[in-house]
Amino acid sequence: MDRRELLKMVAAATGGVVIGGEFFLAGCKNPEAGQSTEFTENDIAFFDEVAETIFPKTSTPGAKEAKVGQFMAVMVNDCYTEENQKAFREGQAAINAACKKMHGHDFMKAAPEHKKAVLVSLDPEIKDYQAKRKEFNKEQDDLEKKAQANGDTNFKRKTMPDHYFIMMKQLTILGYFTSKEGRTGATRYEPVPGKYIGDLDYKKGDKIITGLN
């Protein structure tokens, strides 16, 4: 699977354009990226646990073995705007807070089934956030058109960052399927939970990896 096909798969699995995808495709750094963040070993371990919850080790290697956490750190530094970098970092604290509320301890100390429950619980939050973001962008479109019509050259469009967990899911899939472990251990990705496909094509011998939607 080439990078372009992989981006299409990630977009379909996460319901949106891949954040920083154009720079991933071109293999270059986003000129609007913020200052490089110094991710610690603990940060990388946290990203690995999130990714491993999405792609756990089964008969094929998991995301942790594929070093997806390190991939996330590189992509956030090289391909994300400063605004999205900030949202991504704040997402770590948000996941820990959600885990403490649900299970009484940090995400890193949670049992695998509790980690999965925490990440699945974020789906309604994502849908609500994306709806608000869509409305926000529409308002900005209207304001920009009005400014252009009035000849206002001082108008500066405001932006709203992507949801942190969409970023984490996208980077998990990208990181896994660009790793040696992902390329050799799996050939397809079907999100779970995801939309029902009653006649999913399957060929004998196909390897299917499932993960959180």
Predicted segments with their positions:
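Structural motif
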Residues: 39-44, 62-63, 159-164
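Short, solvent-exposed loop/turn elements at domain surfaces
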Residues: 56-62
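Mature-region segments of soluble proteins
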Residues: 49, 67-213
